[in-house]
């Protein structure tokens, strides 16, 4: 009896890149950037090391690809959540919840993004900072639309505070002291602190 060999499916370049990034996020998060090897990533994907270099050029290029994808995903989930809101309070609440839900459901990416000590000097750290800048600009734009009388400096200051508070609360949830705090609870804690001041500002302006 003659056996028929089923041809292996060929992945598109985009599909292969996604596979590589999925594996790289896991390996970098598990081992840290410096200890991780391209061999380990290639083995996890099931390809040869030259395939990784063909897609990303270097280990740092692979790291930057991981960070860039996380940046795009985070903006997508937070902007989609905010777009569903019907008022400013709901906009903040849904945005915060989307942020914490994303981190909870993408824990390897989260570990990678915030292991700053493992990132190489230069491009890697700059790319991580670009995520903060992206979220700050996004929040500032939302706030400016709701409080145009506040002015750009005040709105940017508010956005910096919000992004910093989100990041610090997320870091606290990684440790033992905050490990039992759910995404919903974290959202409520932020709203308790931040919405009071913003709501008062709206009341004073007659918004």
Across the structure, where does each feature detected by a protein language model lie?
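Amphipathic C-terminal alpha-helical segment
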Residues: 101-105, 109, 141, 159-180, ...
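Alpha-helical DNA-contacting segments of helix-turn-helix folds
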Residues: 61-70, 113
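Short hydrophobic/aromatic patch on the recognition helix
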Residues: 46-56
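Hydrophobic alpha-helical connector segments
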Residues: 65, 79-105, 150, 158-162, ...
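Amphipathic alpha-helical packing segments from all-alpha helical-bundle domains
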Residues: 72-75, 122-147, 156-160, 171, ...
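Short coil/turn segments at alpha/beta junctions that flank glycine-rich nucleotide-binding fingerprints
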Residues: 30-34, 85, 106
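Basic, helix-initiating cap at the start of DNA-binding domains
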Residues: 1-31, 35-47, 60-64
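Short secondary-structure transition hinges
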Residues: 94, 101-140, 152-153, 171, ...
């Amino acid at each position: 009896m003659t056996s028929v060999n089923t041809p292996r499916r060929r992945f598109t370049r985009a599909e292969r890149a996604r596979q590589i990034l999925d594996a790289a996020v896991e390996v970098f998060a598990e081992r840290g950037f410096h200890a991780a090897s391209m061999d380990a990533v290639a083995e996890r994907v099931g390809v040869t090391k030259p395939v990784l270099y063909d897609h990303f050029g270097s280990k740092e290029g692979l790291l930057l690809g991981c960070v860039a994808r996380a940046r795009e995903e985070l903006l997508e989930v937070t902007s989609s959540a905010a777009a569903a809101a019907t008022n400013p309070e709901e906009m903040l609440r849904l945005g915060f919840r989307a942020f914490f839900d994303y981190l909870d459901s993408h824990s390897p990416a989260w570990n990678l993004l915030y292991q700053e000590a493992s990132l190489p000097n230069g491009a890697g750290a700059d790319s991580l900072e670009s995520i903060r800048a992206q979220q700050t600009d996004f929040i500032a734009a939302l706030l400016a639309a709701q409080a145009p009388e506040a002015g750009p400096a005040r709105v940017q200051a508010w956005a910096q505070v919000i992004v910093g508070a989100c990041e610090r609360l997320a870091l606290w949830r990684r440790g033992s002291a905050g490990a039992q705090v759910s995404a919903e609870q974290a959202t409520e804690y932020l709203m308790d602190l931040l919405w009071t001041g913003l709501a008062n500002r709206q009341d004073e302006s007659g918004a």
